[in-house]
Amino acid sequence: MVRILRWFIRLYQIAISPLLGPRCRYIPTCSQYALEALQTHGAIKGVWLSSKRICRCHPWGGSGYDPVPLKAIRFISFHQIDSQTHHVAVPFRDRLMKQNLSNHLG
């Protein structure tokens, strides 16, 4: 599904966007934002984030740098020397990073 959506966005970027000229008020552009949102969050949340972004992109809307948000913050638990459990909020971009951090913390 993500692959098909990405294909349509690339088609827009190559065939339609050059005819319209630069109109996006944000960096990255709305179409680039959509590609990044799909890659980072998958089809459902990526479409939701992209739709919200496109709705904000109008003459009376905001402008400037507006990156795709990171994935949700996950909590991991680990034990310190005093045997009390402490929770740490760590943003994970992928499972490998989470696994490496979990192995490091014990």
From Swiss-Prot:
This is Putative membrane protein insertion efficiency factor. Signal peptide: none annotated. Belongs to the UPF0161 family. It comes from the Bacteria. It comes from Acinetobacter baumannii (strain SDF). One of its GO terms (cellular component) is plasma membrane. It is found in: Cell inner membrane. Its main location: membrane. Keywords: Cell inner membrane, Cell membrane, Membrane.
